[in-house]
């Protein structure tokens, strides 16, 4: 008998200022916090979560302020990005149409980078979405 394949449990984002990070992910990005403690916080409901953890060891400190490799699915990316702009979120890449949908790249207060993605059929590729589409 073959063992079942593994499933995703969690991904970790390391930070130096845990309260500030939790505030950003909970209040600014509006991700639900499912558990919180001195170990960090767990965000999102479902079979997998994002863990935000204090970088207390030298190896973890090297991981603060880097691309996380995390992509968050957003159903209305242009509206969501407009909200994030109003909340002062730093964008590395504005929403841009790609062959696979619309993508944007943001950074948390410590420089950890996340991608935002909406599965929208492209009308073009690689061009910034215009201000007329709702981004200010």
Question: Across the structure, where does each feature detected by a protein language model lie?
Answer:
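Conserved active-site alpha-helix within GNAT-family acetyltransferase domains
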Residues: 19-28, 104, 113
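Conserved short beta-strand elements that form part of the metal-binding/catalytic scaffold
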Residues: 32-65, 113-119
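Vicinal oxygen chelate
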Residues: 1-4, 7-16, 42-44, 59-136
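N-terminal beta-strand motif that seeds the catalytic metal site of vicinal oxygen chelate
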Residues: 1-22, 49, 68-70, 120-136
